[in-house]
Every structure is written in structure tokens, then in C-alpha cells.
Amino acid sequence: MFQTLRFLSRCLVTGDDKSMYYFIMNPTASSGVGRKVWKQLKPILKTRGVKYKLIAQTDKEELIAIVKKLTGRNKKLSFGGTIEVVDAASEEEIKDKDVHLVVLGGDGTLNLVFNSIVDLEHTKLSCIRIGSGNDFARNVGIEKDPEKALIKLLDNPEEIVLDYGEADYVMVDGMRKSRKYVISSGIGYDADICQEASHSKIKKVLNVFHLGKLVYVTIGIKQIFSRSNTRAKIYLDGKGPLCVRNLFFAVGMVHEMEGGGVPFCPDADPEDGKLDVCLAKGAPIPKLLTEVAMVYCRKHLLFSNVSMYRCRSIRIVVDNPQWIHTDGETPCKVRQVIMSCRQGLRLVK
């Protein structure tokens, strides 16, 4: 089925006069940049007579509930937090149509929305860049300028069916959970950076000046000096184990870049049905510092302690619990994780 979808998605998507767009935004995210961007986009929608609903929601649980109801084919709901409704189509007009969600935000908001989608087959997903990360938008070639991105979406949309990942993990207390991701999931060094950055007070200040990346660079250098590696057993597509005495980090990626444009997996193809895995073992600090710098030049694979694999799934079992991230979000520490590639993310850009 997905092969057929991929073929059809290469055709241009043409809208009709009954198309409905559900714009989703956290108005307080990225130091309030979202509100400013919306003020730029709203006149474009009004001028073109576009039917839309803006769901501006600061409460994560409320947003999750709204997305679940929308994508569960149940559009008769109360839009808590909605601040704009323009020329909304009737229930009869849209009940048999796909739901089109447009996320105004960064990778964190996109991850939250994607994990809340009930029916992927009948949900189209678009995004407009807001925030300091935006790795998903960068990976799939979405315009950096929000106004240009919206105009492209309205005038010349293209649908692509992409892969996504799913991380099934065992927490320290033995409980099992899972989360989907659109970019990457990793444990070790990159997850430690995400965890520390999520609690960084200075990040909020730097985001105001569009300098959020500096936080990740600073924390990245700090973590090289401070983190403790762990023993690990790794299984690729059920085969193994590959025993690693000092795991620095392992990341399973759908796309090339994570962490604000870091190309850990430069050959990743988001339409091949497989994850690209970058695995790094511990090394002397000077070597690690050099490797991290060389990642930006895509030269990190020249080092003997860095390996690349391609697989449908990877299972990682660690001796010491490690932080895990999915698209930069760090829910907990884990004892083991299975990262798997899935298909069926309908991106419209």
C-alpha cells in the first residue's frame, strides 16, 4: 500500500474550495515567536479566503486530546484554546475528507502532535518553522521564511509519504512505553545534551535573539568532559549481539540531521523503510572533541570508534540506565530500547 502511496504522492496535491486547514500552535513556545509569526500569516489566509481553524493551546494534555479527536474522525469537538475560526466547513463537507494539520512550531511541538495522531492514513501533516531547532523542516526542505512556506503550501503543495520511527523502551522501574518520532531517537551523549538543554534557563533568553543553538554547543562540549559511558549489547534486525564496552552514544535516524543541523547520518533516506544508525564508542577527550567538530563536515566516519549501520530495527540494552530522546524530547532514563522504522507519514509541503 505504501509503495502506491509513494507513487501517487509524487504528483502535485491540488486543493479545492472546501479545503480546511487546522493550524496548531503553542503561543508561548520559543519566547512567544509563534504569535508574531501568526500575525504575518493571518493576512495571507484572509486575502485568499482560506478556510482554517487556529488551535492555540498552551496545555499539552488539552492539545493531545484535540488532535486525537480531530484525527480520530470525530470533528464534533470543543476547541479549547482556539482563538481564530474562519469560514469553517460544515461537518457534512469534511466528514469524509482527510484532516490537514499545519504545525506552527519546532520539532518538540511537531513530535507532540505526531504522537497524538490516531489515523495516520487519513491525516496530512505540514509544518511552518518556529523555534531554534527545526531539524524536520530543514531535512525535508521547507522554506525558512514562514510566509514563503505558507504560500508554497497553498499555491504549489506536494505530498510525500515519509518514514518515521518508533521507540519502544523499558524504563528504570521496568515499565514499558513507546513514542513515535519523525527525525531521530538516541541514547547516550545526544540524549544527555537534550535533557540538560530542556532545563536550561539561558536557552529561553538566547531564543529571543535566535541564538538557541549556542546552548547546545556549550552543553555538548561540557558533556564530553562529564558523561560516563556504559557497556551495551546491540542487536541489528534481531541479529547479534554486538558487544560495546564503552558506548558513547547510539542514534537511529530517519533523516540526515538532528540537534540543530548536525548530520550524524549523512546518507539517511526518509523513504527507504530503514533507519540509519550512528554508533560511537568512548575515546580520549581530545579525540571526541575533534570528532564532534568533524561531524559538521560529515567527516566523523573517518574515525575508528564511529560506525554506521542501516536496518529496520535496532535493540540496545545498557548496563547503566541512559537518557533517551525522541526528536529531542527526553521522557526518562531507560535500560533498553528498540527503535524501529515505520512508514506512512503524509507530509504536505
Model-identified regions with their sequence ranges:
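Phosphate- and divalent-cation-binding pockets in alpha/beta enzyme and binding domains
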Residues: 65, 112-113, 135-136, 192, ...
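ATP/nucleoside-binding phosphotransfer catalytic cores, i.e., glycine-rich phosphate-binding loops
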Residues: 34, 236-238, 263-349
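Glycine-rich phosphate/pyrophosphate-binding beta-alpha loops
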Residues: 190, 249-265
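Glycine-rich beta-strand-to-loop/alpha-helix junction loops that act as flexible
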Residues: 27, 104-106, 128-130
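ATP/NTP phosphate-donor binding region
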Residues: 1-101, 111, 115, 148-151, ...
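Catalytic core of DAGKc-family lipid kinases
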Residues: 48, 57, 119-248
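Short amphipathic alpha-helical segments
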Residues: 35-37, 114-117, 138-140, 263-264
